[in-house]
Amino acid sequence: MKRLGIAHKPLIIVPNHLVQETAKSFYELYPNANILIANKDDFQKQKRRIFAGKITTGEYDAIIMAHSSFEKMPMSKEVEEQHINKQIAEIVEAQSDLKNRSTVKQLESAKQRLEKRLKTLLESKPKDNVINFEETGIDYLIVDEAHLFKNLMIQTKLNDVAGVIGTSSQRASDLYMKTEFLLDKQNGKGVVFATGTPVSNSLSELYVMMKYLEPHILEKMGIYSFDEWASTFAEVTNSLELAPSGNGYRVRQRLSKFHNLPELMSIFRMVADIKTKEDLNLPVPQIKNGKPTIIALEPSNELEEYMQKIVKRSEAIQRGNVDPKEDNMLKISSDGKKAALDLRLVDSTLEETKNSKARAVAEQIYKNWLEGKEQKLTQVVFCDLSTPNADRFNVYDEIKKILIEMGIPENEIDYIHNSKTDIQKTKTFQKVRDGEIRVFLGSTSKMGAGTNIQDKLKVLHHIDAPWRPSDIEQRERKNIKARQHK
């Protein structure tokens, strides 16, 4: 981009564990490039200004840093004040003519939080030793795995409708403030999002992507809010859905259909270059037997008894007999997922039950380990619940214990959680690629996006099911990109 004059000082931000991997790939393509790489230590409080000074005064072909480091680069007080005031104005607009009391209450709470944040900002003393993002000279931003910033605050009258983003995150708000600044500065350009899942489990996520990348185009069309976008391009429907307890059904309003889809895609394609696997003609290995292998286990008597307790808890909540602080549907969903994985996660005093999922997975891993022994083929095991913890029972350590008992050497088993720094992760990934580590366990958040370990990959195991289909896609990309091993 710099050679073509598109950008003077481009910044690439990637998931925390991919900084070194990205830099390595960049140097493979451009061995003589002048790249500034931000390590975790560079953004420690005492070193932050020094590194920001390097960005400001240096001439680089690219700057590469982690998502979390990027968030530590502040905007000026004036820009942040303007940003917060704009959000407050959007809430006031959404509150007009609103009759739904719960939605009014939600919007008012959001407004009060913003007003408190604004008050704190205005009362804070200027920091003379801080270099703001605007002062660094960065004029182009590339965001890898941009879907991780989807939880951008939406001011809407549809808060009680499923399929509308109901949460907001500070990092999404921070990114939006910076992309807004760059788009204004670069006349609608200067920002690129890279993601394989721009929409994962909510239609409103498409609006968020458009708000990030083409707010000026939406405004030219007279679309200034999510509600105006939804009334033009989406439809609220009533649908019959399984109750969270798993016992019975309920009617739920959901934003589930697009309207005027050709027009919507025409607008989105003004900023989106969409490529599918078929478009790119990527070499994709065939899954054994043409589809995933599902291993269904019969529930133990203990698990069936526990699920009946879940149903009774759900019914008590629906009748209003329980204080939400004591029990609620979120707790029930969490406990149900834990119990389905291993009952010891909800009651540590229990022994291993019949048809333990940990043992069933370990048996499959051991079988594949034997089959791939000569070629040193590897297996990746995903589990988002019950990650390693020395103080309590967890599925990771249970699987490892069983595998060692079966005969797999301990040094051939590892967790992504054991690699704390970027350098450690790079070394660990190389060991997996070389087949030194043959059973590698991790979670979607730490290992799901962009992890390059597929060279000798034979099998990928899903121990638990994540909430979003996009998380399954993120997990399986390692297998899709892998060479085919038999």
Describe the predicted segments one by one.
Residues 48-93, 102, 109, 113-140, ...:
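Inter-lobe coupling linker of SF2 helicases/translocases
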Residues 205-208, 451-465:
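A short beta-strand element within the Helicase C-terminal
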Residues 468-486:
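Conserved SF2 helicase motif VI
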Residues 322-329, 374-397:
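Conserved strand-helix element at the start of the C-terminal RecA-like helicase core
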Residues 1-23, 185-190:
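Conserved SF1/SF2 helicase motif Ia
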Residues 18-43, 54, 213-217:
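Conserved helix-turn-beta segment of the N-terminal RecA-like "Helicase ATP-binding" lobe
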Residues 409-444:
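Conserved helicase ATPase core of P-loop NTP-dependent helicases/translocases
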Residues 385-415:
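Conserved helicase motor "Helicase C" RecA-like lobe of SF1/SF2 P-loop NTPases
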